[in-house]
């Protein structure tokens, strides 16, 4: 928890000192830099909201039963929260921001630390990170929707199946 807190606070400090130049130089890297900072600030607020709401139940007008200490109620608590449209939308934005921030952070790490040096290597690493972000967004969104709708984003026909039960016959007696 402490490394995440350090990363978050340090990221907010860096973001407050950063000068955005997307108006002057609208290159993809400048936009990516902007979105990395924007998602970081959003995630700082979102994670604070998430912890207050889900762990402690301290957000007025929402869940008042904390999940901490109530593991047997956790599914019902989350399902009730995600049934509220704006909460679901907020969490989907949270999943999108997390997926982008993590995937682009991997790419920045690989470039800054000299793991991918050449222009082509950086381009393909970026493609891989974008694919990772899309995959994480899909999995995370499906998980969130699954609390409200069985099967999540998948059609019911894909996840509902009939289980054949075999009738156990009694053993033959001699």
Locations of regions flagged by a protein language model:
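Membrane-embedded alpha-helical bundles that constitute the cytochrome b-like, heme-associated redox core
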Residues: 1-174
């Amino acid at each position: 928890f402490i490394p995440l807190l350090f990363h978050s606070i340090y990221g907010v400090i860096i973001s407050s000192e950063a000068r955005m130049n997307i108006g002057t130089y609208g290159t993809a890297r400048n936009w990516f830099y902007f979105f990395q900072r924007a998602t970081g600030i959003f995630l700082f607020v979102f994670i604070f909201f998430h912890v207050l709401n889900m762990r402690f139940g301290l957000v007025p007008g929402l869940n008042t039963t904390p999940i901490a200490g109530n593991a047997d109620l956790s599914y019902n608590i989350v399902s009730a929260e995600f049934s509220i449209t704006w909460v679901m939308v907020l969490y989907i934005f949270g999943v999108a921001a997390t997926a982008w921030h993590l995937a682009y952070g991997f790419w920045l790490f690989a470039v800054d630390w000299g793991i991918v040096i050449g222009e082509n290597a950086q381009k393909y690493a970026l493609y891989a990170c974008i694919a990772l972000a899309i995959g994480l967004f899909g999995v995370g969104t499906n998980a969130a929707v699954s609390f409200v709708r069985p099967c999540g984003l998948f059609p019911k026909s894909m996840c509902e199946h009939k289980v054949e039960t075999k009738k156990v016959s009694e053993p033959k007696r001699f």
